[in-house]
Design a protein with these regions (language model features):
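Gram-negative outer-membrane beta-barrel transporters
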Residues: 167, 377, 418, 422-425, ...
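Transmembrane beta-barrel wall of Gram-negative outer-membrane proteins
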Residues: 177-208, 212, 216-263, 298-310, ...
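Membrane-embedded beta-barrel scaffold of Gram-negative outer-membrane proteins
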Residues: 168, 305-334, 338, 490, ...
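Extracytoplasmic beta-strand/coil segments of soluble accessory domains associated
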Residues: 36, 70-110, 134
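C-terminal beta-signal and adjacent terminal beta-strands/loops
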Residues: 505, 653-669, 693-745
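Flexible loop and strand-edge segments within Gram-negative outer membrane beta-barrel domains
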Residues: 226-230, 246-309, 325-335, 340-343, ...
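Short acidic/polar hinge/loop motifs at secondary-structure boundaries
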Residues: 106-136, 187
Length: 745
């Protein structure tokens, strides 16, 4: 990686020099940004939070490079895990915990049975900006233990008459293989007449197969699903009416579906032995017909909102919504041990695949008012009902029984401005009242399977041990008061320091827990494993936004006494373990306008360290692995935006990581390394992307290149998870070109 580090050092030097140049003469006040995900009309600089907003221009640029909102956010955010470039985003975390994905504040995550498809629920063509709130918080309810990724859809048209946007894109791998070609078309039409407005749009995208930096097809994960070799459609509509000069009614609906074409099957790779001089051979793909239905994800949502920015002198926001998702997991060619049941078919002959089905009905209300131009107070109430199940669709069995989740949550926030805004004190509380209802059910037959040995060590064993266990259902209730508080000190405009404490609330992946029970006599009402995860986040930060300079530094530490980890079992299926978790990290960011007008340099860095209690003695003693935390990262960028021309070149360095702990120490002490834990270490890699766009007057023409230098690498997830699975050694995507044309009218 020496060459990449030299390249990085040179760009760092450019950025540092730029901060001392004549561009300082252009210093001015930073624009106030309101983050709707924070549930307040106050600007972001009034809140003791670390927030980022990815605007439409930057978002479109990143999507042109990588293809999705999730990839765009992960690329721009150093403390976000590198994406797996798959449909399922299991193990992709923000600050070492799962973020809450939302669209206009509507939660997309399904914590009862987390299928990790929440990053693909709307096409980026319809997203106006992405709001990121870092760290555990309960501002949007359950699920925000790692932060919030809120996708705000396109707004109402501002000018009378008809307007809109058209997008055409084509993509190709480095060698322009026929099966690697892809394309996208999108259209959006808006109409405004007086107080009424309407927006309607649709997109269609066909993705070809991916090729790695060695011109080999990237392997397929048939079960979890792929973005390659897929088709995506999204229909979007928005109707609005201004009831009063300050009051507005909006109805927003979306239907998103991504479905695999099912044209390929996986070819196993080769995981080299520990300390082998040979490079791992990644999983690949050949043409074939996998069994069952291809992996797919479908999300349908509709929301009705009423907002009034001057209702009795305050800001009123209300929303009711319905969200329904159906996530199909593909079938493997080899029969899966988990699905075997001799009562249905002989062992090792039974094929099956699963499907998550979830629907949510919810409402949100908040009212905010400023008193005496100093105290801004907010009161609100959220309600959510979620029903989720995971079915085996080939044999019509229940893997995860239909589970009902109900949450009622009143909350209050206050923000006090002192000394003419030099100091702000903020704080609040949210009371979460949760009920989880699960009916009586029986686990799959394979949960009680015991392999026969010679001599026998268990009776019964083999086929006679299949059968599963009966589990008594229940309706346990949980409630918790979640607190937050902080202080903001802004001695000069654009320079501020802050410190804060916040608590986040979520439920563990109950589906993974309930489907894994293997001993009789379990009662849901008394089972502690389904108790909520309460995490806290403490952080201190400094920000400077003056003139050409935009810099920040944040240190945070987070803990949960009974957190959740994803741990692979003997069959390679990830189960949930409830253990104490502690995470801390440092985030640095520097963006500066260079002396050349329109030219900017940027640097971002994140260092994260996470530990968990592996032996339940109350002390964190082992590192979180790649399924639960991201690697340290350095982001570098150089961008130009002036007149009709805009361009960017960006470089991401993912640093190597060794995972230590009690199990690793025991393995290192054994010269045979029976656990091969070193195979879970991360070797690191560096990637470069570029994009250029020119506005011709009749639309903009863009050319984007992902992985500019065609780097071959094994992705972070594959390098650190399932070291013994030769079907899970996935290489990252090689050099990929995307040519686009977009036109606004």
């Amino acid at each position: 990686m020496r060459g990449e580090l030299k390249w990085a050092a040179s760009l760092v030097a450019v950025a540092v020099v730029s901060t001392t140049g004549p561009a300082w003469a252009e210093a001015g006040a930073a624009e106030d940004i309101v983050v709707t995900a924070a549930r307040t009309a106050l600007p972001a600089n009034a809140l003791p939070l670390t927030v980022d907003v990815v605007g439409k221009r930057a978002l479109d640029q990143q999507i042109a490079i990588s293809g999705s909102v999730t990839d765009a956010v992960a690329t721009l955010t150093p403390s976000f895990s590198p994406t797996r470039q798959k449909l399922t985003g299991a193990g992709e975390t923000l600050r070492g915990r799962s973020p809450l994905y939302a669209i206009n504040g509507i939660p997309q995550s399904t914590p009862l049975r987390d299928g990790s498809r929440d990053g693909f629920t709307i096409d980026g063509f319809f997203v106006d900006r992405v709001e990121l709130i870092y760290g555990s918080n309960a501002l949007q309810g359950i699920g925000g233990t790692g932060g919030i990724v809120n996708q705000v859809t396109v707004g109402a048209p501002e000018k009378e008459g008809v307007s809109g946007r058209v997008l055409l894109q084509g993509s190709a791998d480095n060698s322009f293989h026929d099966d690697g070609l892809g394309g996208k078309v999108g259209g959006l039409v808006q109409y405004k007449a007086g107080d009424f407005d309407a927006t309607i749009g649709a997109t269609f995208e066909k993705r070809g197969v991916f090729y790695d930096g060695q011109d080999r097809r990237v392997g397929l994960n048939l079960t979890q699903g792929e973005t390659q070799d897929s088709r995506t459609t999204n229909f979007f509509a928005r109707l609005g009416y201004a009831i009063t000069p300050t009051g507005r009614l909006d109805l927003i609906a979306s239907r998103f579906e991504m479905k695999g074409d099912g044209d390929y099957v996986a070819v196993p790779g080769i995981r080299r032995p520990w300390r082998s001089p040979l490079q791992d051979m990644p999983t690949s793909a050949i043409r074939g017909n996998p069994p069952g239905q291809p992996a797919a994800s479908r999300t349908e949502s509709i929301a009705l909102s009423y907002t009034d920015s001057d209702l009795w002198g305050g800001n009123f926001v209300s929303q009711i919504f319905f969200n329904r998702s159906r996530d199909t997991f593909g079938g493997e060619i080899a029969t899966q041990a988990t699905f075997q049941d001799p009562a249905i078919a002989p062992v090792n002959t039974l094929f099956d695949q699963s499907q998550n089905r979830s629907r949510k009905l919810g409402a949100k209300f908040s009212y905010e008012r400023t008193i005496l131009n100093a105290l801004t107070a907010t009161i609100g109430f959220d309600a959510l009902a979620d029903k989720t199940e995971q079915a085996l669709i080939a044999t019509n069995r229940a893997w995860v029984p239909p589970s009902d989740f109900r949450s009622l949550a009143p909350f209050a926030q206050a923000n006090l401005k002192l000394f003419d805004g030099m100091v702000r004190l903020a704080g609040g509380a949210r009371w979460e009242n949760v009920r989880i209802r699960i009916p009586d059910y029986r686990t799959l037959a394979s949960t009680t399977f015991v392999a026969c040995t010679t001599p026998p060590t268990a009776t019964p064993c083999g086929a006679a041990s299949y059968g599963g266990v009966a589990v008594a259902g229940g309706a346990p209730k949980f409630d918790d008061l979640l607190l937050n508080g902080g202080i903001v000190f802004e001695p000069w405009d654009g320079i501020r320091a802050y410190a804060s404490y916040a608590e986040g609330f979520t439920v563990p992946d109950i589906g993974r827990i309930t489907r894994a029970f293997s001993r009789p006599g379990i009662d849901i009402d008394s089972n502690l494993e389904i108790a909520p995860v309460i995490s806290n986040n403490r952080e201190i930060g400094v920000e400077i936004k003056r003139g050409p300079l935009d810099a920040s530094a944040t240190y945070f530490w987070s803990s949960s006494k009974n957190g959740q980890l994803l741990i692979a079992n003997a069959l390679g299926v990830f189960d949930v373990q409830r253990q104490k978790v502690a995470i801390e990290g440092l985030e640095l960011s520097l963006r500066a306008q260079l002396p050349i007008q329109g030219l900017r340099a940027g640097i971002g860095y994140a260092h994260l360290k996470g530990r968990f209690d592996s032996n339940n003695d109350g002390v964190v003693d082992s590192d979180l692995d790649g399924a639960n935390i991201s690697p340290d990262r350095l982001n570098l960028s150089l961008s130009y935006d002036r007149g009709p021309l805009s361009a960017i070149i960006q470089h991401q360095i993912y640093f190597s990581r060794r995972f230590d702990g009690l199990a690793r120490a025991a393995d290192d002490a054994n010269p045979l390394h029976p656990q091969r834990l070193s195979n879970n270490d991360f070797g690191g890699y560096a990637l470069t992307d570029a994009s250029i766009r020119y506005d011709t007057g009749f639309g903009g023409v863009s050319l984007s290149v992902q992985n500019l230098f065609d780097k071959f690498y094994i992705d972070y997830s594959s390098d650190t998870r399932l070291p013994a699975d030769n079907f899970a050694i996935f290489a990252g995507r090689g050099r990929t070109f995307t040519l686009g044309w977009d036109y606004r009218f």
